[in-house]
Amino acid sequence: MNKGEDNLVRTSITVPEQLLQKVNELIASGYFASRSEIFRQALREYLQRIEWTERVGDEEYFGALTYVFQHERAEPELVKVQHEFTDVIISTTHIHVSPEKCLEVLLLQGPGKRIAELAKRIRGVRGVEQAKLTVVSSEGE
């Protein structure tokens, strides 16, 4: 158990049945001891990524923002957001996953604060189902 987690609080969450089935399979395979542990770890990792976006400064980073979205619902707003961030978007790759869904990968370079702002805006677009930002420092740290 991590420091600060000695006072656990019981809560409940609602998840799609297929997601819970995958969680149960991971537990059965021995990757995690329990549902609680897998959800705690997932929350920790997600919160660490979000906290980075809140504290990052003007240091230069390289990165990739990958996201899946519902084409008809999200595309107009995504194009608008991308045009507001041409200063950090180096390249865009667009893939048609199905008739309804697309995947895009944005290659990024620029101030971390600006990259974080772009990721936040993309995640906030209705119809974006998943988004993941991966960054590396231009200093190699």
UniProtKB/Swiss-Prot annotation:
SUPFAM superfamilies: ACT-like (SSF55021), Ribbon-helix-helix (SSF47598). GO terms for biological process: response to nickel cation. Ni(2+) binds at residues 83, 94, 96, 102. The keyword Kinase does not apply. Keywords: DNA-binding, Metal-binding, Nickel, Transcription, Transcription regulation. Binds 1 nickel ion per subunit. GO terms for molecular function: DNA binding; DNA-binding transcription factor activity; nickel cation binding. It comes from the Archaea. Its cofactor is Ni(2+). Pfam families: NikR_C, RHH_1. Transcriptional regulator. Belongs to the transcriptional regulatory CopG/NikR family. This is Putative nickel-responsive regulator. It comes from Methanopyrus kandleri (strain AV19 / DSM 6324 / JCM 9639 / NBRC 100938). The lineage of its organism: Archaea, Methanobacteriati, Methanobacteriota, Methanomada group, Methanopyri.
